[in-house]
């Protein structure tokens, strides 16, 4: 086989992929018209998967080579009118330096379903609320070949840490949105 494009992202598919992604998103609720985010909003991002974005699953689904991936932060920064809470982002960046992404050491289907989440104190959430009017909490999951979802915490169910994160943020922010960064089908 002489096809030299095997293993190389084919040009021209980016727009089709963006369209498929937009059409594949599901909005479950939009209470009080929290969405869309506008230039009037100042956004606090919570959850490590705002940075450590899941782009693929496990097993063969994890063997995805891309020219680049765009995490939530970089996606928001493309829109100059949306203000992110940079102080909170710095806290997450420092924590992630000390708690790097667990890729399962690259072994087949060994990446965990979820990543350890940064504890968010009520004080940190309140500090973020001083300069932000909306909160987005990103929860990440991966699964796939040789590592299907299971009815356990950290896979199909939220972990105790994720529940605590959601409770803390929702206590402080009236407008809180949960974004599920999942690498495949989940309900």
Model-derived regions: residue spans:
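C-terminal non-catalytic regions of proteins with extracellular/luminal or membrane-system context
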Residues: 1-187
């Amino acid at each position: 086989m002489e096809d030299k494009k095997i293993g190389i992202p084919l040009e021209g598919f980016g727009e089709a992929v963006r369209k498929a992604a937009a059409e594949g998103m599901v909005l479950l609720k939009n209470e009080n018209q929290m969405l869309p985010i506008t230039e009037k909003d100042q956004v606090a991002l919570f959850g490590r998967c705002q940075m450590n974005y899941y782009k693929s699953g496990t097993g063969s689904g994890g063997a995805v080579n891309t020219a680049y991936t765009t995490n939530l932060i970089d996606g928001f920064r493309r829109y100059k009118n949306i203000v992110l809470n940079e102080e909170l982002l710095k806290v997450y960046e420092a924590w992630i330096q000390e708690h790097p992404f667990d890729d399962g050491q690259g072994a087949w289907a060994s990446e965990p379903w979820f990543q350890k989440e940064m504890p968010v104190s009520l004080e940190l959430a309140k500090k973020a609320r001083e300069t932000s009017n909306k909160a987005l909490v990103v929860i990440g999951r991966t699964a796939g070949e040789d590592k299907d979802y299971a009815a356990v915490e950290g896979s199909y169910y939220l972990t105790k840490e994720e529940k605590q994160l959601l409770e803390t943020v929702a206590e402080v922010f009236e407008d809180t949105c949960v974004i599920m960064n999942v690498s495949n089908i989940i309900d």
